């Protein structure tokens, strides 16, 4: 898999892994790199079968496969333990990594994640599947911002979105790869295993997320033995992009704090 190592390069700097959502590209985390890089050795990677991690995703691909890929990457870098931050699908990878490779994850942040797929998220995924299969890649990519960003942000960034449309269409991961990765995501149900995930975990959500209702993060935090919850009032599904300042403040505050009894954080 393609990866980059950024931020602190001192021998004792803790390693932080950033894992994107369904798009898979590590560039999703660009708004966080400078802030996180002041404190961590930051590893960003492109999920297998996306962006610069070329390859064909096999039939039957699973969340366990995605977590094993990260574990292999960490071992190739001689990283025994890391902080892990994942957005949506990336957060699910983090949960799976903490379940099957618990020694590798010191602290975990799941951004807009869930214990099991919510009916609203399933509805959105079905619409996106239908767009891709019936209308093609450009229609799928053109609709994607509607699920990610608040309406006012969309209105204010129209030119940027037009530029991104061309780039994302040209670098699309491929229909088969996306559908197999999406199937793996939709089939994942952590409810039987949450009690076994003892890694300190922050469930971070935005109350105006159209794709993943905020109550999913509430359920996740409440079901984990060492789960905590943080909410943002605004930002949509990709609030790390739309409200970077608040997002980074919450994220860094939790990653750097010592463990205590605080269970709910606010921006």
Swiss-Prot record:
Residues 14-115 form the AB hydrolase-1 domain. InterPro entries: AB_hydrolase, AB_hydrolase_1, AB_hydrolase_fold, Pyrimidine_utilisation_RutD. SUPFAM superfamilies: alpha/beta-Hydrolases. GO terms for molecular function: hydrolase activity, acting on carbon-nitrogen (but not peptide) bonds, in linear amides. Its EC number is 3.5.1.-. Transmembrane segments: none annotated. GO terms for biological process: nitrogen utilization; uracil catabolic process. Pfam families: Abhydrolase_1 (PF00561). The keyword Kinase does not apply. It comes from the Bacteria. It catalyses: carbamate + 2 H(+) = NH4(+) + CO2. Keywords: Hydrolase. The keyword Hydrolase applies. Belongs to the AB hydrolase superfamily. Hydrolase RutD family. Involved in pyrimidine catabolism. May facilitate the hydrolysis of carbamate, a reaction that can also occur spontaneously. This is Putative carbamate hydrolase RutD.
